[in-house]
Amino acid sequence: MAIRTAILTISDKCSQGKREDKSGRTIEEMLPEDIYEVCQKIIIPDDYGTITRTLRQFSDVLKVQVVLTTGGTGLGPRDVTPEATIAVCDRRIPGIGEILRSESYRKTPNAVLSRGVSVMRDNTLIINLPGSPKAVRECMEIILEFLPHAVDMIHGGGH
């Protein structure tokens, strides 16, 4: 059975049609179709309330197993994705953000400026990815190694 996945691009410019959503497309292209079913892919602005409502909708109503967000994890005044994600979480998973920053730092020291978090809300795993397509690709290569096992564990599978 495929892992029900949602892709959430968080970007003022993409949501206004002023920029193409290359990062969301990169995520979708990298998810093997035999393992993941992308059941939702939307673009929303960098707005705290919109982000929290959308994450709750994905988890509570649509019951997706994984939400991959892209954008809004930096230091800009409208970068509120981590705060909105934490607001809806039941449990934090710090190791994911730590490994993404650590491995990304090998390629660019700017990786330490990413504030992305990973959390669980009920049985949904939510992972914040950076906004740049290059950084998304690098992070996806890392998370694809453990994502199916993480989903299995959330649903009662073994360690």
Model-based region annotation:
Residues 1-159:
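Non-catalytic beta/alpha edge segments that cap or flank active sites
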